[in-house]
Amino acid sequence: MSSDRFGLKRFVFSRFAGSLCDQFLLFAVPLAILKATGSLTFSSLAFVIEWLPRILFFPLSGFLADRIKPRFIFFNVEAGRCVLMLVAFLTLTFHPAATFPVLAVMMALLSVAYVLNFVATEALLPRHISAEALPKAHSMLQGVDQTTQVLGPALAVAISVYGGVGAILACAAVLFAVSAINYLFLETHDLEVAEKMSLRSIVQSNITAIQVLKQNKILLHLCALTWVVNLVYGAALVVSAAVILKEFHLPESYFGVLQTSAALITLITFFFVPRIAKRFGLSTLGTLSFCGMILSGALMSLSLDYAMYLAGYALLMAFDGAFSVYLRTLRSQIIPQKHLGKTMGLIGLMNMCSVPVSGLAVTALAGRFMPLQIIAIILVFALILGLMLVIIGRRTFGYNSWLPPVIAQPQA
């Protein structure tokens, strides 16, 4: 099916609307909970509540994406998110004291929708677009994600000035509704599935994914490295709102500037990532990104003012994006293509576990340490664990570089 017949531009538009809403909420919810409760503990606990359903749903989402018509998935996900926004908006309008439970439950349900949308997108494009058009399609989606990371916080600040988190929820409901209606006009074909959907088929799909991991143990090594990176990344996401409001005593608009600046730096970084990988090799890209994240985290933890923290946070997010490119490229050369979906579902589950773990760590430390001290503690732990993994990986798999290089051609 050609991209014109499928409606790639229509799909990208809906992706833009949905991603913009995601960025609205990622900006507004932590601030709303922190302002309502005055506690970093509740803010980090909400982060954990959001991420747990996300990681648990990864294996099932890959299974569903291989069996259900894509248009049906996308429409129902967006329609469900629209209804959820309206319910949250009405509940907070009549019961403003219930901010924490309402927003925590809302984000948990949204995280499930996000995972299904993400995995369904990964399965959709190769089935509806030619191999020659895939790079362009992925570039368009990457551009959408980076653009909304810039626009989202800035627009959320402007909207919240007039109506707080309620106005953001109402705007998100409208955008999700527009996105859902737009998805109805996509031309997607039904999937040919010989095996009926059952608990047994779900279990068998994940058993196959486990076998792939056993046969390619370096994938487990990459998962462990991802854990280390996500510990630092997750801690930065959880703590940043408290750093801005409590340590630097700045208004919440500065949090929007922080997010927008990070997205801009990340967008600029992606122009250099392919050149670095081509000239110096994929392993060098991974090593530079990993070291850059550690140094950026150190800059954050030692920040004396907002400008230092902004620089460290923006660089951390940029290097995290570059490290993700390294991981995705290497995984695609190791995992057999026929098992890519189910294996990525299982890998996604393992990788994402580290993000709520960082939230739990912040929750445990919040009562005894200041936000910047929490970042420093988690950073030191991640550095020690990362160095141990580098040594173990070099000895186990026999490569000479700091991180695993390209070791195989894509498998069929």
Q: Which residues are covered by each model-predicted region?
A:
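Substrate-agnostic recognition of the 12-TM MFS/MFS-like secondary transporter fold
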Residues: R10-L26, E50-F63, K69-C82, V102-V161, ...
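Membrane-helix boundary and inter-helical linker elements of multi-pass secondary transporters
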Residues: K35-A36, D66-R67, P96, R127, ...
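Hydrophobic alpha-helical transmembrane segments
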Residues: F100-M107, S111, K136-E192, G256, ...
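Helix-breaking motifs and short loop linkers at transmembrane-helix boundaries and internal kinks
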Residues: T37, K69, T91-L92, H249, ...
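C-terminal transmembrane bundle of multi-pass solute transporters/carriers
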Residues: L56, L60, I73, V77, ...
